[in-house]
Amino acid sequence: NFIFHMLKKYPDYRIVCLDCLTYAGNLSTLAPVMDNPNFRFVKESITDREAVYKLFEEEHPDMVVNFAAESHVDRSIENPEVFLDTNIKGTAVLMDACRKYGITRYHQVSTDEVYGDLPLDRPDLFFTEETPIHTSSPYSSSKAGADLLVLAYHRTYGLPVTISRCSNNYGPYQFPEKLIPLMIAN
């Protein structure tokens, strides 16, 4: 949805999508833009440093928006290593590429899961940007680790970064196991 929005709003921008197409990925969703001369799809993982550096050398991006993530809480409990690899190591690879190739802006798409859980009997409570990190699963811990790494790269190397901690993004093409499609189906 982000790619469609950006190509429509900024038709002169070059948009490159790097995606390893895990179980929730579906290349056919990009069919409407595959022939757009300002769009390129690359099937690789953000954990593959050589592939990421090669792509940066070929495309010379100005900015990076990192949507890449393993993002299912239950799956993170079954196999946390995959989450640590993609969400933390992959973020480190992207941050190193941003340093090496002089990226002017990096945006980390995170999750509200880094804040933990709110008590169900307290509807008056809510999260803010100042809420302390209080993770409750390997998934949320891996995303919090990535967020902290991004902030460390900003402080240590001066990289211009932003982080958003969204709650249950939804829209066309969303994988059916995610919250909103699951609620609609049930």
Regions from the PLM with identified roles:
Residues 1-169:
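N-terminal Rossmann-like NAD(P)+-binding domain of SDR-like oxidoreductases, especially those catalyzing
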